[in-house]
């Protein structure tokens, strides 16, 4: 499904639209529409750990999120070899509103979410 990015994706400010493809219940990928060579791996944080945060009001307004909206959350992953050394950024989740195909990334404060990190090893959460 193609989403319009309503706020810049950190490090990829030129991306305005991307295709979201779910790989399985844990992983997904986004591929930039204007540059298909840009592909980012995502993880469903709820499949990995207990994960909760408040979506800021400005993001709710930007994505037209209300109590009935179908919202999904993913976090970026830096893939490593071996895969269990891959890193998940829990402090900058991507928010997807499936109702209107819009998305945005937010930067959470480590002060507000001290249990989250920008580079948690995935092996800390995946049971073998």
Curated annotation (Swiss-Prot):
GO cellular component, one term: cytoplasm
Annotated localization: Cytoplasm
Keyword Zinc-finger on entry: no
GO biological-process terms attached to the record: bacterial-type flagellum assembly; regulation of translation
InterPro entries: Flagellar_assembly_factor_FliW (IPR003775), Flagellar_assmbl_FliW_dom_sf (IPR024046)
Main location per the UniProt record: cytoplasm
Keyword set includes Membrane: no
Keywords on record: Bacterial flagellum biogenesis, Chaperone, Cytoplasm, Translation regulation
Gene3D superfamilies tied to this protein: BH3618-like
Domain of life: Bacteria
Stored Pfam families: FliW (PF02623)
Assembly and interaction partners: Interacts with translational regulator CsrA and flagellin(s).
Record function comment: Acts as an anti-CsrA protein, binds CsrA and prevents it from repressing translation of its target genes, one of which is flagellin. Binds to flagellin and participates in the assembly of the flagellum.
HAMAP family: FliW
Family: Belongs to the FliW family.
Annotated protein name in UniProt: Flagellar assembly factor FliW 1
